[in-house]
Amino acid sequence: MAKKSSSQLIVLSLLAIVSLALYLGYNLPNRWQYALENRALSLIAIVITGAAIALATMIFQTVVNNRILTPSILGLDSLYLLIQTAIIFLFGSSTLLSMNSIALFVLCTGLMMAFSLVLYHFLFKKENQNIFFLLLVGIIFGTFFGSLTTFMEVLIDPNEFQIAQDIGFASFNRINTQILWVALAILVATIVFSLRYWHCFDVLALGRENAVNLGIDYQKTLKILLILVAILTSVSTALVGPLTFLGLLVMNVTVEFVRDYRHKVLIPAAMLISIITLVLRQLLVTHIFTFRTTLSIIVNFVGGVYFIYLLLRANKKWQ
C-alpha cells in the first residue's frame, strides 16, 4: 500500500511539473519575456489557489465526514460577492477599480474571517453542538448574502452591472504581485500550522464518537480546523474569486485515484490534482476558447455534472 501510494504521488508530481511547463512554454509570442513573466505569476496564483482549496476541502470533508459537502456551504463565496457588489452599489465601480489591491484583499479576507469566527463563536458556545447545525446556518447565510447581492445588482447602474457580474467569475489573468506574496505567505503559514493535526485526520474520519474514544479533544480540534478552513477559503476566494465546485471534483477524483485512507498521502495528492486541474483548464480558457469563456464556467460545469453523478450513484446504493 505504502509503495503504491508513493508511486502515485510521484506520477502526480511529474504530471504537475509537465502541466506547469506546458502552460509556461506553449505558444509563446515574439515578446516571450513579457508573456513568460505574466504566465509565471498566473502559475503561482494557480498553485496557491489549488493547494488552499484542496487542503480546505480535505479538512472540511474529514470533519463533517461527507464527500459531497465543501467549504462553500458556509457562505463565504456569497459573502465575497456581497462585499464587492456593496462597494459598487455604495461608491461606484470606479472606487472598486481604483482601490489599493492589498487593502481590498485584506478587507475581503478580514470580513470573511470575521464572519466565520463570529459564526463559530455563537454556534459552539454549547458543548457537543452538532456540526450539521453549523452547515444549516451556513446555507441560510449563503442564501441571504446571495439575495442581498442580487437585490443590489438590480438597483445599480446597468453600465456597472457587468462589472458586478464579472466579480463572480474566478480569473488568473489579473493577479496583483503584492497580493500574490501576501497570499503565499498566509498559505505556507497555514499549511505549516496544520501539519501538527494531520495525524488526527485519520481518526476524525472515523466519526465523532470514535475520535473521542481514541483520545481526540474533539470540540477543540474541530474549532481549530474550521478556522483553518475559513482562512484557506477566504484567501483563495479573495485572490482569484469563487471556484464553487473545484473542491468537490478534486476530492472525489483524489479518493478514486489514490484509494488510501491516510491523509498524509491524500492531502499532497489532492493538492497536486487540484493544481493539474486548474492548469489544464486555464490552458483551455487561454488557447482553445481564447478567453471566450471563463475558468469558473468550465469548473462549475464539470463539477456540477460530477455532483449530479455522485447524487445518482448514492441514490442507487440506497435503493
Task: Give the residues covered by each predicted segment.
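Alpha-helical transmembrane segments in inner-membrane proteins
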Residues: 1-319
